UniProtKB/Swiss-Prot annotation:
Xref: PROSITE patterns: HOMEOBOX_1, HOMEOBOX_2
Record's compositionally biased regions (Basic and acidic residues): 237-246
Gene3D superfamilies in the record: Homeodomain-like (1.10.10.60)
Annotated stretches, region: Disordered: 195-283
GO molecular-function terms, A-Z: DNA-binding transcription factor activity, RNA polymerase II-specific; RNA polymerase II cis-regulatory region sequence-specific DNA binding
PANTHER family (alphabetical): ANOMALOUS HOMEOBOX PROTEIN, HOMEOBOX PROTEIN SIX
Pfam families: Homeobox_KN, SIX1_SD
Keyword list, A-Z: DNA-binding, Homeobox, Nucleus
Record protein name field: Anomalous homeobox protein
DNA-binding region positions on the chain: 135-196
InterPro entries linked to this entry: HD (IPR001356), Homeobox_CS (IPR017970), Homeodomain-like_sf (IPR009057), KN_HD (IPR008422), SIX1_SD (IPR031701)
One BP annotation, GO: skeletal muscle fiber development
Length: 379
């Protein structure tokens, strides 16, 4: 020990230690491997030396230093030391020490006194040893391909739970022990039982929603697109919302915005034309207009969004000339109906508009255009 410490101090400033110094360090570590009390001062001197990287390339020195660090509860430092050493040809003892250190780390984390074989296997898979400790790679624990095929053929064709005599025969044929054969078939049965359990969640998901694959994207109508109904014009969304909310009824009319106009029985059916209009103002307005220009003076009555056109009458100062008894009352479903005679008596001969609010210019010019087109088509 003293001679080693003396040589170590003499070659402290050298780039590489002499071969006899490395050999002496390895022999001392191998001799004191069972006596940690004497090994600890030697390990401390090696780790504090500037030549430690060269000394740790010796398998006995690396093994002694890692054991001392592990004994001092410095597992992380021991793992870093094993990762940094470059042992020629590797060392199975260093690989086993690497695994033992990680076993203790897992036991400390789980709070258990020992690990099961499965836990040790998972620990080795998660923490493989560095390539410097096993240059040829980890030794495969799997059976050869021919052995696995023979055992699998027996499980598929004969029995998955062979008897003791069958296991002994298989052990002789495959050069395995009866315990290895027993464990292989036990693992095979465990894997077969686990397959249906993995398939159940997918089958349940498919059974709960069988049309998930066939379901296409829902075709939704945009909220801004108008709806077209039979006998009605396109109605934008804002007008539908106003109809659902129900704006206050005008005292001049009680007709709904899309209800047909109640006509007197004296009106000839062939001379009466009902035209839907696009409502841009208040839907509850009532207008009586006398067309001009190419419409030949046709009379139009608009209630809500409907336009009723009638050929011109003889009396120029009134829109309608029938007497009150000849006019049919409005349907009883609408309280307080207003007859066309009452409206005509209070209106001038040219144009009168009676509504809750002033109709917009777009609606007025739209009505005039429809009036001209209807006059030209009917004329």
């Amino acid at each position: 020990m003293q001679s080693f410490l003396t040589l170590l101090k003499e070659h402290e400033d050298t780039c590489a230690p002499p071969a006899e110094l490395v050999t002496l360090a390895g022999r001392l570590c191998r001799d004191f491997q069972d006596d940690l009390a004497q090994l600890q001062p030697l390990v401390t001197a090696i780790l504090d030396s500037q030549l430690r990287l060269h000394l740790l390339d010796n398998a006995d020195v690396a093994l002694a230093c890692a054991r001392v660090l592990d004994q001092q509860e410095q597992q992380q430092a021991a793992c870093r030391l094993l990762e940094g050493c470059q042992v020629p040809g590797g060392s199975q003892e260093l690989v086993q020490l690497w695994n033992d250190i990680h076993y203790r780390l897992v036991m400390r984390r789980l709070g258990v006194a020992a690990l099961t074989p499965v836990q040790k296997f998972r620990c080795r898979k998660r923490n493989p040893p560095p390539p410097s400790l096993c240059p040829e790679g980890l030794k495969s624990r799997n059976f050869p391909r021919e052995v696995r095929e023979k055992l699998h053929n027996f499980a598929v064709g004969v029995n998955t739970n062979p008897s003791k005599a069958e296991r002994e025969n298989l052990a002789l044929e495959t050069s395995l022990t009866p315990e290895q054969v027993y464990n292989w078939f036990a693992n095979y049965r465990r894997r077969q039982r686990a397959l249906p359990q993995h398939m159940k969640p997918a089958q349940q998901a498919t059974a709960e929603d069988p049309g998930a694959r066939e379901r296409g994207p829902d075709l939704l109508q945009p909220s801004g697109n108008p709806r077209v109904d039979s006998g009605f014009v396109d109605r934008p969304q804002w007008s539908e919302e106003r109809e659902e909310k129900g704006p206050p009824q005008s005292p001049q009319t009680t007709q709904g915005p899309w209800e047909p106009l109640a006509l007197a029985p004296d009106f000839p059916a062939d001379e009466t034309v009902s035209k839907p209009l696009d409502v841009s103002g208040h839907p509850q307005s009532v207008q009586l207009e006398e067309g001009l220009g190419t419409s030949s003076g046709r009379t139009e009555l608009r209630v809500g969004s409907f336009l009723v056109t009638q050929p011109p009458l003889q009396a120029p100062e009134f829109i309608l000339t029938q007497s009150p008894p000849e006019l049919a009352p409005a349907p009883s479903a609408f309280p307080g109906p207003v007859s066309a005679m009452e409206l005509s008596q209070a209106l001038p001969s040219s144009q009168v508009q009676c509504s809750d609010s002033q109709a917009s210019g777009d609606a007025f010019w739209g009505a005039r255009m429809l009036l001209e087109f209807s006059g030209s088509s009917l004329g």
